[in-house]
Amino acid sequence: MSDTVKQFSVRVLKDAPLMEFLAERLKDYSRTQLKSLLSHRQLWLNGELMLTRHDHPLKAGDRVDIRSSKTMRRNQKLEHSQLKVVFEDEHIMVVYKNEGFLTVGTDREKLQTVYHVLNQYMKTFGQDKRIFVVHRLDRETSGLLVFAKSKEVQEALQSNWETLMKERSYTAIVKGQLPEQQGVIKAYLWEDKQLRMHASETDNGGQYAETKYSVMGTKGPYSMVQLWLKTGRKNQIRVHLQSVGCPIVGDKKYGGSASPIKRVCLHAGLLTFKHPMTGQMMHFEWPIPSSFNKLVRVK
């Protein structure tokens, strides 16, 4: 196989995990080359889902697209220990950030942020180029973010956020067990003078917030929970889980105990949204951090 991969598609004939399917159908590719396709984000499922896991389950009838490495070279120019580009076109960027890395600057820190790194990257294509913030993740949270490449796209995303954003999913490890296996946490959130958020069951002038949850598994004192935002308030998931007596492990600001894996156990691993300019449905997933499995392992 040459170093330049042209775009083509392969139909799935029987259920199989991704790497097993690739090894069987792409016999001209070495194992290393197949792994390279995965690591360089060149594999897509049915034209919508970027494949990031070697064991992603495929179903008979699915279509796996292998996209040209030439289209990925622009992405590969950005190399940063705390940040990876997942998708990029002329309008948007989708990136993954590690925990402990700021989305935007603060009074104390301006440079070590996703925003600054992406802005510097954009300037390599022209001094007039810049990036535009669409939404944020807390410093302590790892996960996926979408940025705009123009004011027009930023406004299109933000003004139509509830219409365009179809799903945002998080995974958390909490201390304790939620009252039900599935449910919705509802509360009004307000901020005190120390910039700490609080939850109230009654309307006290705060912002109404809803978080849907599903318990994925439990082990000892810990539970792994998948969460979906119905609203997007500051620290919403963190304060909601604290309000029901199940604070996120490592989240000392909101009642969490010390983390055995040395991090706040919250990960924004799924984004599904309609592209603001093309109308295409975009779906991105980033695997749950392997360290989470040390506390609760879910098959």
Predicted regions located by residue number:
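RNA pseudouridine synthases
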Residues: 2-299
